[in-house]
Amino acid sequence: TPLYSSAASDVYKRQAKAGVLALAKGLSRTYAREGLLVNAVSPAFIHTPMTDAMMNKRSKELGVSFDEAIESFLDQERPYMELKRRGEPEEVAAVIAFLCSDKASFVNGSNYRVDSGSVATF
C-alpha cells in the first residue's frame, strides 16, 4: 500500500511508512557531516512472491485469470499507477545501485519513489 493511499484500513501501515521516511530524513541530517548518506526507496506494486500470492488469491476469489486479477487490482486499487503493470525488482535495484554509487555522492535525505508516477507532485 502506498504511503499516499486513501484506504482508512491502511492507517497503521501508512503511519509506519511515514515513520521510516522521517527516520531516513533524520539520519541523513545527523550523519551527513561524517560522510554517511541516507536516502529512502519507496517501491509501489512490485513483482515479488508476495504480490504473486496476492494475485493468485484474488484470481481465485474473482474467478478470473492471473493477468485479469492484476488488471482489476490496478484498475480498482491503484488507478493512479499510469503504467498499469507491476514494477520489476530490477527496476527497484537500479535505483538502489545508483544510490550506492559514486554518482549519488551529493544525494542525501531523499525519498525515491519507484511507483509508476503514482504520486503526482511538482
Feature locations, PLM:
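Single conserved hydrophobic/aromatic residue that forms the stacking wall/gate
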Residues: T1-Y12
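Active-site helix of classical SDR
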Residues: A16, A24
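Conserved SDR Rossmann-fold cofactor-binding beta-strand/turn motif
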Residues: L37-H47, C100, R113-D115
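A conserved structural motif in NAD(P)-dependent oxidoreductases
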Residues: F66-E68, Y80-V92, K103
